[in-house]
Structures are given as C-alpha cells and as structure tokens.
Amino acid sequence: MRAAVVTKDHKVSIEDKKLRALKPGEALVQTEYCGVCHTDLHVKNADFGDVTGVTLGHEGIGKVIEVAEDVESLKIGDRVSIAWMFESCGRCEYCTTGRETLCRSVKNAGYTVDGAMAEQVIVTADYAVKVPEKLDPAAASSITCAGVTTYKAVKVSNVKPGQWLGVFGIGGLGNLALQYAKNVMGAKIVAFDINDDKLAFAKELGADAIINSKDVDPVAEVMKLTDNKGLDATVVTSVAKTPFNQAVDVVKAGARVVAVGLPVDKMNLDIPRLVLDGIEVVGSLVGTRQDLREAFEFAAENKVTPKVQLRKLEEINDIFEEMEKGTITGRMVIKF
C-alpha cells in the first residue's frame, strides 16, 4: 500500500509499505481522506525530534475492513477517525480523570506510530471514534484534529454567550475556532490575521469584527470596539511570536489566553501584567475522544462547516511548501 513517509532530508516520500497482521484490540481501516495539519509540517521538519520512516497523518477518516477477534467496539463497515491521540494507557491519573491527551504514555498518530497518510491504517479499536452518518467524510477529516483542537480550546477559554473572544490566525485551525465559538458557544468574535483574504473569509463565517494586525494597532482597535475594556478571552492558533504577545495585550483583567499553535520561538510574556491583572495563559492540546464525538456532532448539525480542498497524495510536498508560505485558507485534504 502507498504511504507518505518522512525521509532523512525533511521531505516526504510516497513509498510502498506492507502492514503486519492485526493484534488483539486492533482494527484495519481503509483510508478515505486525511487532512494535512501544521503539526505534520513540524514532524516532517524534525522540530519535535527525528522520526525518519514514520508515516505521517493524524486527520484520517476511513472504513473498517477487518477487526481482531476480541474487538467489540467496531464492526466492518464503520466509518472511523484516525486522530493525533492514537492511544493512551487508560490507567493513569490523566486517563482516569478525563484528561487522556496528557497521558505520559500516549501514542500519537503520524509521530510516534504510523499515521493516516496511507491507503490502510491499523488502529486501536477503542480509540477510533465513529463518524456520524450525516457528516461528510472529507469534512470529518478536518474535524478529527483541527476541529476537535479548536472546539476544546474554545471550551478551555471559558467564554460565555455574548462575550468577546479573539481568534488569532484564521487558517485551518482559526476558521474552525471562529465557528465553534460563534455557532456553538454564542460568543462575539474578533478575527486577527495579516492576510486580507483570510480576514474576508472570517467575515463570511460570521466574525463580528476583523483586524489586520499588520496595518493597524490591534490593541487600539480592540479598545475602541470594547469601550476600553478588552476581550474576555483569546485563542491563539498562529505559530508566530508577535500574534501570541498581541493576544495577551488585547484581553481584559481576569481574562484567559489559550495557546493552541506550536511556535518554534520562545514567547515573551509580560509577567507583571499577568500578575496584576490576573490573566491566565493556558495550553490546550487537541481533545479527548469525548471532545471529538461532540465536535463531530456539531459539524453533523451544520453548526460548523470546514473549508476543505481535496488534493492527491503525490502533492504532499507541494502542500507543505504552500503551508510554509502561509497561502492556505482552510484545510488541504488528501483523497485516497
């Protein structure tokens, strides 16, 4: 079967791979779609360590074609996800308190184990979340990581209906954060970016205000918008240093800043302001299986509509080049 494999020179090679036989608790999935995430770019570039030889992909959707004898949670024909949180231990303090993404023994698809950019994938059956029948599978691929990540981040922000939430970076993650916050949580949205096309897209999605941080002072604009109060919360999907600092600068006292993007640079935080204004900066890592089920359901109810563009597996290196240039709006999804 064909698979997108990380090479030593930080490229991706389309190679033939042979899968082993299933072990107890596993299922074999025929991949239909796999979204391309910025984390895949980090993995390819060895930003988190050298994983030469691994098959990329953690936004996979496909149908079960085989199950091990002991599997009861899945059956042949089920449409399921292959997500970043591939498997956790199920026994530690995190797994037993609804925080399984923080498990110290967690396995991650497309990083520590082979992922979904392949024609077939072996999954741990209990961790393959079923996709609602009403949800388009190509759209579901985007929800599997980008969707659940931003849905969880918006939940972590504690934003309430009618409050102001700022979303920094309106790419594959940011556009979904905007939709979950607006259409599910009932928040008012300010979209921040330096790309006018992405900001126009944010306006189409229902953003109450858009701010090009390159052309104007985002702090001054927010103060005008909120009668000098500041935003109630921000979610940062950008991977650049400047927007993260701006996300702290635009919030009010007692607000929460949620970090989602994974910048390579170290951040500069104004600690005195955090202390004096009681501002919380928290990280939010993808989502649990329950978060993913909820994220899928909201998408199936058309409250969230991922913008996807279908591509071929052979185009994966081109997609990464476009990603590095910042020219992608929405999500690139590989169709198998």
Curated annotation (Swiss-Prot):
Q: What is this protein called?
A: Alcohol dehydrogenase
The record's section on Gene3D superfamilies has: Medium-chain alcohol dehydrogenases, catalytic domain (3.90.180.10), NAD(P)-binding Rossmann-like Domain (3.40.50.720)
EC number(s) on record? 1.1.1.1
Instruction: Tell me which UniProt keywords the record has, alphabetically.
Output: Metal-binding, NAD, Oxidoreductase, Zinc
Q: How is the cofactor bound?
A: Binds 2 Zn(2+) ions per subunit.
Reactions listed under catalytic activity: a primary alcohol + NAD(+) = an aldehyde + NADH + H(+); a secondary alcohol + NAD(+) = a ketone + NADH + H(+)
Keyword Oxidoreductase assigned: yes
**EC class of the enzyme, as a word:** oxidoreductase
| Annotated positions binding Zn(2+) 1 | C37, H58, C145
